[in-house]
Amino acid sequence: MTDTKTLLPLRSVSQLNQYTRCPQAYKLARIDKVWARPAAWLPQGTAFHTVAEVYEKALAEGREMSLERAQEIFREEYAKDIGALCDETPNFEWWFWSGPYNGERDIERRFHLGLEQVEKFIAWRKDKGQQIWTTPGRGICSTEAWKDTNCKECEQPKPAIELPFNIELDGIRVRGFIDAVVVVNGELRVRDYKTGNSPGDDFQLGVYALAVAMTYDVEAPKTGDYFMAGKKGIKAKPTAPYDLTDWTRERITERFHEVEARIQAGDFEPLPEPDKCGFCDVNYSCPVFK
């Protein structure tokens, strides 16, 4: 018997943002899958996110984690990811520079910056703190007070840390992870951790708010913010909250479908700009950049 199930396009916020920045870069990275220039800021961000996730889950379980242990996790994760990038691209001349720092020097610099960001995050967590939301239980056992913890049809309540989602928007499946959903003044707020510059855009947060509503059948969080881990010497703190109420399901769906239509039509026109092209990780394969 033939399986006639239709596979839906699978998208993410990062895919949409990449296409919007430059359709040609999207094609090179996502379709042609060309080699991507490595940058030390990528492992720095990944390692910090891992520390924040592990730290918050420890607190949710009633366990304390020392600064020393948190920084040890950062060291391990950073070394692992840097090692993987070095295996693929051992010549540091091919790595991204960061200001005056070449690839090799930037690896060392961001190692220390990441340790500092971990320290600032934990200091902020202990001083200001954040209240992590607990998701509602889902599934057929929800009326049984979660007696069957092995039920594969159900999802137990859990702290909203590194929260996965997979939602359908009228024929397009959108998936991703939410760093944290917090409770501020009794209301939900989606939060994303950033180790670099502030995005200055709330679309990502709007998608996260919609994902929370669709996944857990709750009212969509009205606000969202970015926790800025802080560059060297700069205090770590969340941004001012973004008002997400304009990011309705209809508006978000329309945006994904607009991009999807252009992808399916093969519209991959390059949008070159000096600053943008200089930091594009597939620029070495781009005929326009060359």
Curated annotation (Swiss-Prot):
Domain of life: Viruses
Pfam families in alphabetical order: PDDEXK_1
Name of the featured protein: Gene 69 protein
Species the sequence originates in: Mycobacterium phage L5
Name of the coding gene: 69
